[in-house]
Amino acid sequence: MLTTFFETKAKELLKNPAQLKGQAEIQAYLQYSTPIPPMPREFKYQEPDTAIAMQVLNAVAPKGAEEFIKEELLGRMGITQYHWEHAISGLPKSAAGSSILSRDMVKFGQLILGRGKWKGEQLIPEAYITRATSPNVHSYGTAYYGFFIWSEDFQVAGKT
């Protein structure tokens, strides 16, 4: 969990962004944050959590995170027109910063509804989709957060 100390330290680190390239960004997150407290913990959606996930993906994907996403997900789904901002680390921003056509956004919905399958090919493990779309953490009202997926019930014409 990030603290006020980290937020203060982050402002100092951002004065020289070159020092946060590559894995240095994640090192700063871990070095200047407090240990995770024991249960119960309060849920807090924050950018560093997604940045850590992007760093891990970048470390394990043979061609790096950006090429992996481009080839193994977007490319297989026929998504070619998109823009993805880059973080200070040089990796794609993970919490925000992507632009995609609405018709391609619908493809992500279809991928999730298809339990990770796209045109018969399993692109994302079904078990991950199940966990990601399950109400793992209550956020507010009827909103829940899974693994990078928000879910919330809405009523339309009296139906949920």
Model-derived features with residue positions:
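Short, conserved, surface-exposed binding loops centered on an aromatic residue
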Residues: 97-101, 121, 139-141
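Carbohydrate-binding/catalytic loop surfaces
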Residues: 87-100, 150-157
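Active-site-adjacent helix/loop patches that line small-molecule binding or acyl-intermediate pockets
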Residues: 1-79, 100-106, 110-111, 116
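Short, flexible turn/loop "capping" segments at secondary-structure junctions
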Residues: 49, 85-88
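Surface-exposed patches in mature extracellular/periplasmic domains of secreted proteins
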Residues: 44, 84, 119-121
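Active-site Gly/Thr loop motif
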Residues: 79-81, 130-160
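A conserved catalytic-loop motif detector
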Residues: 110, 118-136
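Residues that flank catalytic or metal-binding motifs in active/ligand-binding sites
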Residues: 94, 101-104, 128, 143-145
